[in-house]
Amino acid sequence: MKKFLVTMLFLLTFVNTGFANDGTLLYEKNVQNQIDLCGAKIMNSNQIKEPVVFVYGLNEKKNYLKSAQNVTSRQVIVYANDYKYVSDENELAAFLSREIALAVRSYDGIFKGMLRSLQMKASPKKFEIVADKIAVDYMVKADYNPIALITFIQKTSPQKRYDTISTKNLTSKRLAIIYEYIYTKYPYYLANNTYINNEFYQRFLLTSQNNRRLLQEKIKNNSKENLKYE
């Protein structure tokens, strides 16, 4: 009797594990499909001809994706840790647009983009801002709301004390530049802001008062200077 019970428990555990694995595979397949469709829409809408592949990998696949020989630098890898912050398709488009921008830039220039890739590594702050702006353009052309880039970054990039010796810009600086870019080039989205009641957008408004005040002064004075956001 004891052997029978032990055997049944083992079988039940095996079956439950099988169902769990099936559920995980189905979930990954659905997420991958969503990422592929969103990525394809962005690339088609922006007439991007360079090949870029999208890969959804859970944390346990991270090392494999980095080391596999058939994985190139032109693959956009979306980890579960990134995807969990995506609240809607606009935010997914925000994430993918930035990564596509960086991947496409790696094709530019001589030596099949090798020099450009080295430049990006040498000036990460500069290209971080460039990618943010290109992402806004990509999103608008693909009929996505670029304000979602603000809400996504607000959630995923904690503010640091300073960026003097960092390879990344302060989050507040990035968001201020994105806001100014949208304000200047795509004012429709701010005038008809569907994210106005979004808690993360409200958080941005609260923490960006000084930077937005600088922008208002710039507009008031009809200035063309590049503001030194903090």
Regions found by a protein language model. Name each.
Residues 78-79, 96:
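A secondary-structure boundary/capping signal
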Residues 82-83, 90-91, 99-115, 142-144:
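Catalytic Zn2+-binding segment of zinc metalloproteases
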